[in-house]
């Protein structure tokens, strides 16, 4: 065989083999997943379950490594979505309220009392009319949404006094995540909100730089917030964000269809397990917090009405600003649970 023919054959073989080689090279050795908290918390546990399922089901082809403490963004969870867009983060497992400063529409689930109980939340996250629209928003923002879990109902704790009614919030210095809407809710009741990452919040509570914080009681327990001077809790259930599992668009598009299916199904299974864990912890949290010597106030129905009235103006203003059509669909679904 002539040398020229040999070279032609080699070139043809290389050309035929190139796409397969390229596809193999597109898979990274590691995909970085950011979570605000480690697996000791239900939220972080959901991320761990997801990463393990993907690794096992792809035989290690897709290796997702969890980075808790929002360490990929120096502890500032509000920067996670921007960092994903920049290629610093590949996978997100977090509360969209943290990213609503970057993409306002992601915060639709955190309007005050929009999902007042688990029955309402379940109806919303299982509604195709709601979730198809929400997932479209996430895609347009730069990520492929896979599944939703639950971060848990957020409760107030403070070091000063029992908080029974909205007037009790006056003058309280409260740490909130970087959501302008959360800040407005607290301002509307006379509190003094300060935006702070979770990494900065704990020393601020310990030093007395802030008096209060709001988080699920599961977080209160896991982080031992009672040791940071927090003596009083009000279980008012004012906000319950989803836990969104999502992949950066360029990463998602680099995977073949079979692996995309595996990753999506793994996220759905992880979300299911994570929700079950959050619900179990929710059913036990008041008893466990009280056992630590913390005063826990559970509002009566009449008191809950006062809280809802106190946040109504903020709700109306932010409904218009965020995504009124989608929020209208959420309201319809929730109303259906009241009639059922």
Regions picked out by a protein language model, each given a short descriptive name:
Residues 2-121, 129-130, 136-340:
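N-terminal secretory/targeting leader peptides
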């Amino acid at each position: 065989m002539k040398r020229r023919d040999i070279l032609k054959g080699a070139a043809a073989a290389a050309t035929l083999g190139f796409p397969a080689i390229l596809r193999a090279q597109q898979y990274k050795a590691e995909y970085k997943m950011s979570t605000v908290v480690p697996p000791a918390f239900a939220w972080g546990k959901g991320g761990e379950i997801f990463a393990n399922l993907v690794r096992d089901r792809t035989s290690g082809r897709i290796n997702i490594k969890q980075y808790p403490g929002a360490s990929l963004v120096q502890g500032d969870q509000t920067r996670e979505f921007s960092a994903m867009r920049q290629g610093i983060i590949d996978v997100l497992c977090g509360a969209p309220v943290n990213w609503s400063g970057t993409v306002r529409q992601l915060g639709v689930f955190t309007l005050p009392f929009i999902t007042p109980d688990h029955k309402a939340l379940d109806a919303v996250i299982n509604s195709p009319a709601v979730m198809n629209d929400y997932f479209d928003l996430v895609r347009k923002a730069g990520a492929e949404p896979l599944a939703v879990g639950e971060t848990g109902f957020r409760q107030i704790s403070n070091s000063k006094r029992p908080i029974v009614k909205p007037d009790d919030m006056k003058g309280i210095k409260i740490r909130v995540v970087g959501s302008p809407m959360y800040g407005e809710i607290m301002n509307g009741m006379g509190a003094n909100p300060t935006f702070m990452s979770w990494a900065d919040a704990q020393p601020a509570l310990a030093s007395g730089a802030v008096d209060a914080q709001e988080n699920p009681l599961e977080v209160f327990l896991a982080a031992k917030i009672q040791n940071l001077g927090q003596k009083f809790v009000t279980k008012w259930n004012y906000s319950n964000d989803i836990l969104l599992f999502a992949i950066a668009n360029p990463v998602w598009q680099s995977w073949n269809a079979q692996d995309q299916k595996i990753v999506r199904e793994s996220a759905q299974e992880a979300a299911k397990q994570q929700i079950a864990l959050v619900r179990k912890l929710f059913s036990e949290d008041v008893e466990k917090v009280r056992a630590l010597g913390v005063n826990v106030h559970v509002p009566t129905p009449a008191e809950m009405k006062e809280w809802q009235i106190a946040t109504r103006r903020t709700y109306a203003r932010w409904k218009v600003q965020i995504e009124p059509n989608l929020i209208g669909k959420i309201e319809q679904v929730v109303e259906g649970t009241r009639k059922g």
